[in-house]
Amino acid sequence: MEVMNEQSETACFDVDGVRYRYLYMKEDDPARSRRRTPVLFVHGFAQDALSWFPTSRTIFLERDVYGIDLVGHGGSSVPVHPAPYSLPAMGEALLALIELIPGKPLVVAYSMGGRVALSALLEVGPAAFAKQTSGLLLESVGMGPKTQAERDAAIKRDADMARRLRETPLKDFMTYWENLPLFESQKALPKKVRAAVRANRLANDSEALAKCVECAGQHRMPSYRETTAALRDLGLRGYPALYLAGEKDAKYSKLAASLHEEGIVRTRIAPKVGHNVHLEAPEVFAACVHSVATR
């Protein structure tokens, strides 16, 4: 999904022998840039940093913006060994990039990227995470299994998905993927947008995606109790955080309602859209980002 302009640049960093690419766009006015919170985007499954940039143009005009390519995606390494695909390993890479960014970034993470962000939070703990970052926006992110039965079901789903990735051509898998109920609302998007999303998905490596599912799928998450305790701790520290879900995304809008009722984190339901709010409602998404940014 090549939408980079003349202000876009890429760079790389290494963690435990794995090379990660990231993209960044600088605000035109350096003085204003220093006054505004930078934003760090963490993409979802079968995406890359570029997948953020067709949306929410207002963010890119007002702030320095960074986007990481997670392992096995985009321009980052595609290791043979499974270890780098684990949530802790990807969380460590995210923390390494956070250290490279001037200023404390607002971390905006979608779906699988949210699992990575939560892993980073749990790795260093809420106190340290709050010192390293200025805020957290989680978009359509699972919070981990509540029970062993839920974990067992996730293990089966993820194993089935990894098997499908290995046994079918990628284009056939992506046809299956984009027809899941989770993405039904995206069928209302313009044909050009849907074609770009599909091309972005097809640019991936099937084996790398299978390893991501096996090593960083829902079944690999810490428990719901552990992740929500960390989020609640952030809130008690006055740390700005937001959970965002689409109204048409039955699973994650229900989760958002639960998080709100339990007083774990501030939530927002985007009307008339599904799982990918930043793609389907970029103006709403941009407003949410600015609402979490501290300055």
Where are the regions a protein language model picked out?
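Flexible "cap/lid" loop of the alpha/beta hydrolase fold
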Residues: S119-L122, A130-R166
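Conserved acidic catalytic loop of the alpha/beta-hydrolase fold
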Residues: P88-P105
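Conserved alpha/beta-hydrolase catalytic His-Asp/Glu region
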Residues: Q148-D152, R164-A230
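Conserved HGGG/HGGXW glycine-rich cap/lid loop of the alpha/beta-hydrolase fold
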Residues: D16-V78
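Gly/Ala-rich beta-loop-alpha elbow adjacent to hydrolase catalytic centers
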Residues: A109-G113, A117
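Catalytic histidine-centered segment of alpha/beta-hydrolase-like enzymes
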Residues: V273-A286
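Conserved loop-alpha-helix segment in the C-terminal half of the alpha/beta-hydrolase fold
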Residues: L234, G238-V273
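The conserved beta1-alpha1 loop
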Residues: V42-G44, Y110, A245
